[in-house]
């Protein structure tokens, strides 16, 4: 319980500009138009307490996949009540050897809190300096907006962490999938990554890319 309180305290700190300063809330209406500031607002007369609650973070994600990890997001519009409030969160489950590969959130900074296990986490600055830290239960680390970062289970058992973001829709781009899980011609991938034809085709084969 103390750990959960810490997580939500962090969430309350990472948002400095809130839609709620204009009106009480703007529950996401997924059927309406979306703008850079978020989803359009649901009719207040149709808003219920269920819009402000999310129950999906208590269940472990399925880590039976190539990265041996799972992310359970609580973003808008799935978590409708956080729309426009400048916060969101997610659950990270990592089996032994599991990894959240190098990725970036273009729309928000991220704070991670380790609940179980040991996680090696780090990010790379725009000057290509690496900031790397081994985190244990109760430890936290912040990842600045837009910078490449990762989380790796470096312990002997499963690892669990919760992350909070300074946006209700932080966005996500995972570098290996962006490079090799698409239909960009292999010769262009080779030219822009300095990898060989065999290496590119191997990675595309593993991650589902074509061409």
From Swiss-Prot:
Expression across tissues: Expressed in leaves and flowers.
Localization of this protein: Secreted, Extracellular space, Apoplast
TM segment ranges: none
Main location: secreted
Binding site for Mn(2+): 103, 105, 110, 149
GO terms, molecular function: manganese ion binding
Keywords from the UniProt entry: Apoplast, Disulfide bond, Glycoprotein, Manganese, Metal-binding, Phosphoprotein, Secreted, Signal
Induction: Expressed with a circadian rhythm, with peak expression at the beginning of the night.
Disulfide bonds: 26-41
InterPro entries documented for this protein: Cupin_1, Germin, Germin_Mn-BS, RmlC-like_jellyroll, RmlC_Cupin_sf
Any one of the GO CC terms: apoplast
Residues with Phosphoserine modification: 140
Occurrences of domain Cupin type-1 (ranges): 55-201
Residues making up the signal peptide according to the UniProt record: 1-20
PANTHER family documented for this protein: GERMIN-LIKE PROTEIN SUBFAMILY 3 MEMBER 3
Family affiliation: Belongs to the germin family.
Its job: May play a role in plant defense. Probably has no oxalate oxidase activity even if the active site is conserved.
Oligomeric form and interacting partners: Oligomer (believed to be a pentamer but probably hexamer).
Record-given protein name: Germin-like protein subfamily 3 member 3
